[in-house]
């Protein structure tokens, strides 16, 4: 496969040092692992392509990031309608979702929206979405 033009120097170096690496083979193997996990009841979610802080990035950056996830990860996991936001952030601090970012994420198929932080969890069920705060169980 032709190397993308946007590879940084570290990736180019790694690929040069591993001439046996085959992206298509790696993708096929990853898809098999994902399917085996799904067969056991696992669900997959987006955490964004680039671990983005959705409350701080522009709509355009969110769209570009989401497109990368949809093109590169969805084919491996069979798609998902769940997004778990990075950095304990959320789309809004308002009680109900609205706005361009929500409408965009909804338009590309997301129905379940979760943040991850150390505050008390919550659940919000609306006609157009399910929103849940989730407890961060990472150990620092």
Predicted regions: what they are:
Residues 1-40, 75, 79, 91:
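Active-site beta->alpha N-cap acidic-glycine motif
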Residues 9, 30-36, 45, 64, ...:
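A sequence-composition feature that detects small, non-aromatic residues
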Residues 22-23, 51-60:
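Second-shell loop/turn segments in exported
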Residues 27-28, 34, 42, 69, ...:
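Generic detector of bulky aromatic hydrophobic side chains
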Residues 39-44, 127:
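Sequence-level motif detector for i,i+2 pairs with an aromatic at +2
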Residues 43-51:
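Histidine-centered catalytic micro-motifs
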Residues 56-140:
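C-terminal active-site subregion of NodB/CE4 polysaccharide deacetylases
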């Amino acid at each position: 496969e032709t190397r993308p033009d946007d590879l940084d120097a570290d990736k180019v170096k790694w690929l040069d040092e591993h001439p046996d690496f085959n992206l298509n083979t790696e993708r096929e193997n990853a898809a098999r692992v994902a399917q085996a996990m799904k067969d056991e009841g696992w669900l997959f979610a987006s955490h964004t392509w680039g671990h983005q802080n959705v409350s701080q990035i522009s709509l355009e950056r969110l769209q570009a990031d989401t497109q990368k996830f949809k093109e590169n990860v969805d084919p491996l996991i069979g798609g998902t309608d769940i997004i778990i936001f990075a950095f304990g952030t959320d789309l809004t601090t308002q009680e109900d979702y609205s706005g361009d970012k929500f409408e965009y994420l909804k338009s590309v198929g997301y129905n379940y929206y979760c943040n991850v932080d150390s505050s008390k969890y919550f659940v919000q069920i609306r006609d157009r979405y399910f929103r849940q705060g989730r407890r961060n169980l990472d150990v620092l």
